[in-house]
A protein has these predicted regions:
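Soluble metallo-hydrolase cores and metallopeptidase-like ectodomains found primarily
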Residues: 24, 102-107, 117-154, 235-336, ...
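Second-shell loop/turn segments in exported
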Residues: 23-30, 46-56, 97, 121-125, ...
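Noncatalytic luminal/extracellular "stalk/propeptide" segments of secretory-pathway proteins
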Residues: 49-175
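Acidic/histidine-rich catalytic neighborhood of metal-dependent amide-processing enzymes
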Residues: 182, 186-188, 213, 323, ...
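Catalytic-core environment of secreted peptidases
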Residues: 30-48, 53-76, 100-104, 160-187, ...
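His/Asp/Glu-rich mid-to-C-terminal helical/loop segments that flank catalytic regions of hydrolases
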Residues: 352, 356, 468-543
Length: 544
């Protein structure tokens, strides 16, 4: 019955979404391309130095965001401050020697960053493994609901290092009843592999890299290998002495020297009854670590609800980026215009729409611009532990992350499609704009687990992570497909991600402001909460 009521409310709201007959429609009209352009160009400006946390440029960026939150009329998170300080431990790792894999046939010598990467969250200046025994643990998964335990039966795991396959057993499958088929589950994320290894008490975990399974090439693994960040209270979360990656061809040779074929093992490891086994091989590696304790702020403002409630709706758009990187045509500054200056502009403009309402929504509206998303959404992890309003009373979170300025779109691509009834609500709201919802066609890469909404999801809060992406209104689907491929190859996390005042088309971003204001407005005024799909892996986390 609740589903019918909510869809009815969404339909009634959608009927008026393109008119001017209610206060929300009038409030929406304050949104403008000019504001979005001004915000984006300021946050992606060279003076912000790529917004790497702890830099002078980052200080300028968060200061600007706080000023704009105040100008919009948002209430500060603490006293008169819009900053929520997040205690961070920054670590830098250098591996001064090759990793050595001793097999029955040879010793493989791997150069750091080329054949392997290694790090540890342990606060120790030096970590050395000498001839630690290796074992093959399939996908490194313990999933009782699928009858799978890739660590079952291994003796003395505390002395050994697990070699595991990236992603999960559903990769490439059309059977959605088993690990969601080709749609990655959290079991497929690298973060989970290290977490599970720590729970099993192993000495280390080495993930076998493969582009499609990881969702990115080796260059991304290599780029993040030198430095890591942790929320200080969480610094032992991945507490194996060794967390690392090895190139696929290295793993292929290692296993061949032990009498196994990697492709056959991948097929075997997909089965529920797969059992791990020891390899007649060892690993030796040395890591030298330096640490620094610092603080970096989340920027948070909110609009108090009119219903005297501690319930809330949360909008997300992270402010941090990468600073400097490998130069392209002499430019090494990674401005982060599409990742994620546009999302902060989107969030600020939605805030302006809410402030333009003659009466505040029933629920509180929180606008959270977290720090350290690029290093594991640390700011959001901290926020869910220290929230402005109780996490169990957050109706939903709405997140935008990575949005190229290509103009209007017909689609609304939902990453994490099928997890909750937010999908059907959004479908109704999108229709008056001539838009339709669709699942992310690249869900195998686990993008749902790779942005700031995910710490909320882990606490049982439904999330909407969506945007126009696959069907450009002016140029069509094939053009969009070509642009997406070009974006990942030439712009994402590169100095080319900057504003282009003469050609940037903000009309698509304005679409997202209007649509997701509509969604937030409905969530902020309805009774009850969105519902998880009973088949979602997060359906039973939070009961309410």
């Amino acid at each position: 019955m609740k589903q019918i009521v909510l869809l009815g409310l969404a339909f009634a709201w959608a009927l008026s979404a393109c008119g001017g007959g209610n206060p929300a429609d009038r409030a929406k009209k304050v949104a403008s391309v000019e504001h979005l352009k001004t915000y984006t160009e300021a946050i992606a400006h060279d003076s912000c130095e790529g917004r790497r946390p702890f830099s002078a440029g980052a200080d300028r960026a968060v200061g600007y965001i706080a000023e704009q939150m105040k100008a919009v009329g948002l209430k500060p998170v603490s006293g008169e401050s819009y900053f929520q300080p997040v205690p961070i431990i920054s670590s830098r790792t250098v591996c001064p020697e090759p990793m050595r894999l001793r097999t029955p046939k040879q010793t493989l010598s791997l150069e750091w960053l080329e054949g392997y990467t290694a790090f540890s969250a342990r606060i120790e200046p030096e970590i050395t493994l000498k001839d630690a025994p290796l074992f093959f643990a399939g996908y490194g998964i313990v999933a009782p609901e699928y009858g799978k335990n890739d660590y079952a039966g291994i003796e003395h795991p505390e002395d050994k290092v697990a070699v595991v396959i990236v992603n999960d057993p559903g990769l490439g499958s059309t059977d959605e009843s088993y690990f969601n088929g080709d749609i990655m589950t959290y079991y497929g994320r690298w973060m989970y592999k290290f977490e599970e290894g720590a729970r099993q008490g192993v000495k280390g975990v080495l993930i076998i890299h493969e582009d499609r399974g990881a969702g990115y090439p080796w260059s991304v693994v290599r780029a993040s290998a030198r430095s890591k960040m942790y929320v200080e209270s969480d610094s032992e979360a991945y507490h194996c002495p060794l967390n690392g990656w090895i190139q696929q061809e290295v793993a292929r040779q290692l296993l061949a020297d032990n009498g196994y074929d990697l492709d056959q093992l991948i097929a075997e490891a997909k089965k529920p009854d797969f059992k791990p086994f020891d390899l007649k091989s060892t690993v030796s590696v040395k890591m030298e670590n330096t640490f620094e304790r610092q603080e970096s702020p989340n920027v948070v403002g909110y609009i108090p609800g009119s219903g005297e409630t501690d319930e809330s709706v949360v909008y997300l758009g992270h402010w941090d980026h990468l600073g400097y990187g490998a130069p392209i045509n002499g430019d090494s500054l990674i401005n982060g215009a599409t990742d994620n200056a546009v999302a902060i502009a989107w969030m600020l403009e939605i805030a302006r729409c809410f402030e333009a309402l003659p009466k505040a929504s029933r629920r509180n509206i929180v606008f959270l611009s977290p720090t350290c998303e690029e290093t594991g959404f640390l700011g959001t992890k901290y926020y869910v532990e220290h929230p402005l309003f109780p996490i169990e009373k957050v109706a939903a979170v709405i997140n935008l992350d990575v949005f190229p300025l290509w103009g209007e779109n017909n689609d609304v691509t939902i990453t994490g499609y099928g997890n909750s009834d937010l999908d059907s609500t959004l479908a109704v709201l999108a229709k008056p704009y001539g838009r339709y919802i669709m699942p992310d066609p690249d869900a195998y890469n686990g993008m749902f687990y790779r942005s700031d909404h995910f710490p909320f999801v882990q606490r049982g809060v439904p999330a909407m992570f969506a945007k126009g992406w696959n069907d450009n209104r002016q140029h069509g689907k094939e053009w969009a497909k070509e642009q997406i491929a070009k974006y990942w190859a030439e712009t994402y996390h590169k100095p080319t991600d900057q504003t282009h005042p003469e050609s940037d088309d903000y009309s698509g971003l304005l679409q997202e402001v209007q649509l997701f204001f509509d969604l937030g407005y409905q969530l902020a005024n309805e009774e009850g909460y969105p519902k998880w799909n009973p088949k979602s892996e997060f359906a039973n986390v939070l009961k309410r």
